[in-house]
């Protein structure tokens, strides 16, 4: 596993396909480590919050954006925010609206933490982000399972139609997974099969984080 020399803040990156179990494993580790490090000393940042602002575009133009391409994300701002947190500074995390397809005026203030869990589909494609991580994980869940989970989530939680979900999957989600996301797993310290309920992977990550906290 990678060893970042700055231990004021430990950053764990969790990447993988959309609906591969990233959020589940992130929330599990978060909840199980809170008692160890303190409620206010661990936090989760989602890469989705850093989708670029599209308020200057019409809604018709926004929906045409390829959200599974690295260019849709502001990784520069995300890396700057992580560096600020590592220096002990608070940051204003953007809020992204899945229904409006752009950022809102709201921000989430995150104060410095001992542990930050970072989760998102394209995290491991960017060397700036990889270089800030103390450990990196890739959720290697079969794409057909991810598609079913994504369809259920996007229809129920994001107001999408089933037709639009499957059209997006065919046009951008699967091609971008093959071009960018899947190749990025070569950079992961741990590759996790079977989704976010893999107990052994969770315990290994918790043990590694605990070791880094003692260093």
UniProtKB/Swiss-Prot annotation:
Gene Ontology CC entries for this record: cytoplasm
GO molecular function annotations of the record: ATP binding; cytidine kinase activity; uridine kinase activity
EC numbers for this chain: 2.7.1.48
BP term (GO), one: UMP salvage
Pathway: Pyrimidine metabolism; CTP biosynthesis via salvage pathway; CTP from cytidine: step 1/3; Pyrimidine metabolism; UMP biosynthesis via salvage pathway; UMP from uridine: step 1/1
InterPro entries linked: P-loop_NTPase, PRK/URK, Uridine_kinase, Uridine_kinase-like
Broad class of the protein's primary localization: cytoplasm
Catalysed reactions, as listed in the record: uridine + ATP = UMP + ADP + H(+); cytidine + ATP = CMP + ADP + H(+)
Keywords tagged on the record: ATP-binding, Cytoplasm, Kinase, Nucleotide-binding, Transferase
Database matches in SUPFAM superfamilies: P-loop containing nucleoside triphosphate hydrolases (SSF52540)
Annotated localization: Cytoplasm
Enzyme class: transferase
Residues annotated as binding ATP: 16-23
Database matches in HAMAP family: Uridine_kinase (MF_00551)
Protein family (similarity comment): Belongs to the uridine kinase family.
The protein's name in its UniProt record: Uridine kinase
Taxonomic source organism: Aliivibrio salmonicida (strain LFI1238)
């Amino acid at each position: 596993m990678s060893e970042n020399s700055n231990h004021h803040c430990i950053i764990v990156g969790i990447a993988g396909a959309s609906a591969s179990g990233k959020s589940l494993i992130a929330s599990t580790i978060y909840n199980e480590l809170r008692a160890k490090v303190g409620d206010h000393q661990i936090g989760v940042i989602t890469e989705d919050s850093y989708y670029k602002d599209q308020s200057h575009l019409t809604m018709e133009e926004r929906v045409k954006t390829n959200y599974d391409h690295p260019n849709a994300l502001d990784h520069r701002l995300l890396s700057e925010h992580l560096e600020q947190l590592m220096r002990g500074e608070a940051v204003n995390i953007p809020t992204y609206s899945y229904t409006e397809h752009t950022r809102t005026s709201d921000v989430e203030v995150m104060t410095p933490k001992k542990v930050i869990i970072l989760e998102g589909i394209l995290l491991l494609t960017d060397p700036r982000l990889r270089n800030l991580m103390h450990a990196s994980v890739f959720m290697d869940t079969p794409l057909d399972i991810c598609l079913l989970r994504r369809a259920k989530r996007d229809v129920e939680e994001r107001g999408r139609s089933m037709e639009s979900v499957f059209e997006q999957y065919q046009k951008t989600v699967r091609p971008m997974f093959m071009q960018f996301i899947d190749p990025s797993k070569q950079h992961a310290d741990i590759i996790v099969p079977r989704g976010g309920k893999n107990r052994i992977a969770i315990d290994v990550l918790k043990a590694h984080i605990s070791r880094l906290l003692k260093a």
